[in-house]
From Swiss-Prot:
GO terms for biological process: protein folding; protein-containing complex assembly; urea metabolic process. The keyword rRNA-binding does not apply. Disulfide bonds: none annotated. InterPro entries: UreE (IPR012406), UreE_C_dom (IPR007864), UreE_N (IPR004029), UreE_N_sf (IPR036118). Belongs to the UreE family. It comes from Pseudomonas savastanoi pv. phaseolicola (strain 1448A / Race 6). Involved in urease metallocenter assembly. Binds nickel. Probably functions as a nickel donor during metallocenter assembly. GO terms for cellular component: cytoplasm. The gene is ureE. This is Urease accessory protein UreE. It is found in: Cytoplasm.
């Protein structure tokens, strides 16, 4: 088994690839298979942001592994105006939905309840297969409502770490 504990800086070469959907890239503990069909165990530090497409990991045996975002069923949302798109983003954010933001569009994981809401808001919703790369969020690190022990969840804003738009 290829055992992985560490994220590393980008590398020019790698020995294996992990093709993972967003849910799998969000887990700190995961058993999966590499593209080369090798059994892999991920044991990453808890509380970190999800793995991103193109991120690199280092296995215990020294091998470098590249993470690839596997295409998955998404809703691609467009609207007839910037106001309507902003309103759709507001309502999705109010539901704490993981959201990928592009120039004039939004993408989110397929969900029939959210599709019905978006339809009611007048959005155009198209089902597509694509890699899902949602925003990390302004505060990153996790989602907590509890006030008990909140000093453990005092994350500084990460506004400077938003991904590059394509």
């Amino acid at each position: 088994m290829l055992v992985i504990h560490n994220r590393i800086e980008p590398q020019a070469e790698w020995a294996a690839e992990l093709h993972l959907n967003f849910e799998a890239r969000s887990k700190s503990r995961l058993r999966c298979f590499s593209a080369e069909n090798e059994d892999v165990g991920l044991f990453l530090q808890r509380g970190q942001s999800p793995l991103r497409d193109g991120e690199f990991l280092k296995a215990e045996d020294g091998r470098v592994v590249r993470v690839c975002a596997r295409p998955e069923k998404l809703m691609h949302v467009t609207c007839s105006s910037t106001f309507e798109l902003t309103r759709a983003a507001y309502h999705l954010g109010n539901r704490h939905v993981a959201l990928q933001v592009g120039d004039g569009w939004l993408r989110l994981l397929d969900d029939y309840v959210l599709k019905a809401m978006l339809d009611q808001l007048g959005a155009t919703v198209e089902t597509i297969e694509a890699p899902f790369q949602p925003e990390h969020g302004a505060y990153g690190g996790g989602h907590h409502h509890s006030r008990a022990g909140e000093e453990d969840f005092n994350y500084p804003p990460r506004m400077h770490q938003f991904g590059v738009r394509k």
